Amino acid sequence: LAESDQELRQAPYRVLADWQEEHEGNLRIILPDTYGTQGFLAHAPDWLARWTGIRIDSGDPAEGAEAAIAWWQRHGEEPRNKLVIFSDGLDVEAIESLSQRFRGRVKASFGWGTMLTNDFVGLLPDDALAPFSLVCKAVSANGRPTVKLSDNPLKAMGPTDEIDRYKRVFGLGVQTLRALRV
């Protein structure tokens, strides 16, 4: 609901500053991909690097974690003390791969949702039991449209002109086109 581009650019950090006033410890998890992880981390205030961890919820999960590790290191933080929560379309194979890659480098955790409780892909003809996505997001606030960019362009939401504005304002970096599993 920001009036100017500058207010818009600072809005995610203002929300997180408010969150920090209310919550401690394990509830201080950064979700950076709303307007693009690369731009979010590039403009993030230093105090945010002291939070408990980060949730990687779109784009390539390994690339997202590597970006977070590099960001923490630039801010003098020890990545091995940080929590990385991977949570986008995970299955057993992805969890095992990410766990191996980041073992000893970060505290890895996995938000395993739909594919934990509905991994019946291919059991019936025509994928009759295929999982579906049930995600609720606000589409407007105070009569103005909302926008979500994500690190995956397939997850973008909002009017095209506003998406273009947000990409410009937040300096959206590289987006990884990944098929949406659910």
Briefly describe each language-model feature range:
Residues 37, 50, 59-82, 87-182:
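Gly/Ser/Thr/Ala-enriched C-terminal appendages of enzymes
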Residues 1-64, 97, 102, 140-144:
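Buried, small/hydrophobic-residue-enriched core segments of structured protein domains
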